[in-house]
Design a protein with these regions (language model features):
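Extended, low-complexity, turn-rich repeat/linker tracts enriched in Gly/Pro/Ser/Thr and Asp/Glu
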Residues: 16, 39-42, 55, 66-83, ...
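Extracellular glycan-recognition surfaces and repeat-rich motifs
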Residues: 2-41
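Extracellular ligand-binding interfaces
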Residues: 65-135
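Extra-cytoplasmic beta-strand recognition segments
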Residues: 6, 45-76, 147-151, 157-159, ...
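Short beta-strand-plus-loop segments that form exposed binding edges in beta-rich domains
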Residues: 133-138, 160-171
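Amphipathic, heptad-repeat alpha-helical segments
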Residues: 187-228
Length: 228
């Protein structure tokens, strides 16, 4: 894989194909000595790279990232995806890996000077990143880890990060710590794939626990959430 850390080239995206629509843009930032963060912003976009001459079998991607729609940390309107060939997983939203106030360690697993407070009414639940620097610390601590897996049958694997676009100004998909692993054939990969599935189950439970309140006015930001 070429430039998995997004540190090469004049714009840091050397080796990657980038497609931007509807005003989308790409950039990098963060705390370099902690973790470089790349991101796509606004509109719809696709950042991808195709690997060839690979051994056939099961491959897994691990990447830290989140999707923030319209600059709203409470939004569950998700258009961000991490993908491998025709398999994709939606990026976590801010609320899926809140660091609790009691567990927050400044400049270790969060950046209190930059992070936003996540509240339930007046009650502080914890903190979520909303800047490049905040993502560097959160991701380096293992927060917002996403997985995707697929089977390669022709020696070719395309990996990528994309947003389908929400039509809302301020969409943001920051990511880093990208790794791609070869897990072997289907039988050999079972144990590692179980970890991926466990991650999906944990995410599903988190989403179930985050039903929007009846008083929330931004219903367009949560089009798929119902408390029925």
């Amino acid at each position: 894989m070429v430039n998995p850390t997004f540190t090469d080239g004049e714009d840091s995206f050397a080796g990657w194909n980038t497609e931007a629509n509807d005003g989308a843009s790409f950039s990098t930032g963060g705390v370099a000595e902690i973790m470089k963060i790349a991101r796509g912003k606004n509109g719809s976009f696709d950042i991808n790279q195709t690997l060839t001459d690979l051994t056939n079998g099961i491959y897994m991607m691990s990447i830290n990232g989140l999707f923030l729609s319209g600059g709203d940390i409470y939004s569950e309107f998700n258009a961000g995806q991490f993908y491998m060939n025709n398999t994709y997983n939606y990026a976590m939203t801010s609320s899926e890996d809140i660091i609790a106030e009691a567990d927050a360690q400044d400049q270790v697993n969060c950046l209190l000077s930059d992070d936003e407070e996540y509240k339930d009414g007046e009650e502080l639940i914890g903190y979520v990143p909303s800047t490049f620097k905040g993502c560097s610390y959160a991701y380096n601590a293992g927060r917002y880890q996403n997985f995707c897996a697929t089977e390669v049958t022709d020696g070719t694997l395309t990996i990528g990060m994309r947003s389908l676009g929400t039509g809302i100004e301020g969409d943001w998909l920051p990511f880093g710590n990208l790794h791609v692993y070869y897990l072997g054939n289907a039988e050999e990969a079972n144990e590692k794939l179980a970890e991926v599935l466990d991650g999906f189950v944990a995410r599903a439970q988190t989403i179930v626990n985050l039903i929007a309140s009846d008083g929330y006015e931004g219903v367009t930001q949560r089009p798929n959430i119902s408390n029925e």
